[in-house]
C-alpha cells in the first residue's frame, strides 16, 4: 500500500516537473531567463508582448514588473498587454541599490497574496528579481542565505551591487527580528 502511494506521488511530481518544463520551453523564445520556480512562481527578464497571452493560457494570474519609468520602457503599454491577456498587472518600480523597506514589503505582500498566483515576476534582466526573491526566501520563508543566494543566482542575480544590497538588507532586518 505504501509503495503504491509512493509511486503515485512520484508520478504526480514527475507530471508537475514535465508541465513546468513545457511552460519554460514554450515561453523561452518570448521571455529571456524564463524560469518556473514552482507551480506558483516564474521569474524572467523583460518579456515580449506575445508572452502574456501564453502565460494566461497556462493559468498564470498576474505579472509583477520591477522596472521603472526611468529605464525608458513603456510601462503603460505593458500594463495594457497584460490586462488584454486577462492577467493582473502589478508594478513595484525598483531602481538602484540599496533595497528600500517599502519596496521589499510591497514585493513580499504581492508574492504572498494567493489571488496573484501563479505569478510571473520580471525586471529587465532578472537581476532585481533575484535580489528581491533572495530577501523574500530568507526573511519570510526562513531559508538559509546560502540556499537563497543559490536560487537567486539561478534566477539571474549576477550584479555584485544587487547581491550586496540584498545581503545588507537581510543582515539589517535579521538583527531587528532578534
Where do the model's predicted regions map?
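A phosphate-binding catalytic loop at a beta-strand-loop-alpha-helix junction
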Residues: 119-130
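Bacterial N-terminal signal peptides
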Residues: 1-9
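Cys-dependent protein tyrosine phosphatase-like superfamily
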Residues: 10-119, 134-178
Amino acid at each position: 500500500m505504501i509503495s503504491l502511494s509512493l509511486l503515485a506521488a512520484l508520478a504526480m511530481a514527475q507530471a508537475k516537473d514535465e508541465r513546468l518544463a513545457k511552460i519554460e520551453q514554450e515561453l523561452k523564445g518570448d521571455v529571456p531567463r524564463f524560469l518556473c520556480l514552482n507551480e506558483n512562481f516564474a521569474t524572467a527578464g523583460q518579456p515580449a508582448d506575445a508572452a502574456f497571452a501564453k502565460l494566461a493560457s497556462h493559468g498564470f494570474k498576474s505579472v509583477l514588473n520591477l522596472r521603472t519609468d526611468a529605464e525608458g520602457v513603456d510601462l503603460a503599454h505593458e500594463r495594457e498587454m497584460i490586462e488584454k491577456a486577462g492577467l493582473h498587472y502589478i508594478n513595484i518600480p525598483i531602481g538602484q541599490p540599496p533595497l528600500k523597506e517599502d519596496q521589499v514589503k510591497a514585493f513580499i505582500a504581492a508574492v504572498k497574496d494567493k489571488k496573484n498566483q501563479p505569478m510571473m515576476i520580471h525586471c529587465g534582466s532578472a537581476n532585481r528579481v533575484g535580489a528581491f526573491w533572495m530577501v523574500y526566501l530568507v526573511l519570510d520563508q526562513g531559508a538559509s542565505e546560502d540556499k537563497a543566494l543559490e536560487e537567486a543566482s539561478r534566477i539571474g542575480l549576477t550584479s555584485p551591487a544587487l547581491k550586496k544590497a540584498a545581503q545588507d538588507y537581510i543582515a539589517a532586518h535579521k538583527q531587528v527580528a532578534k
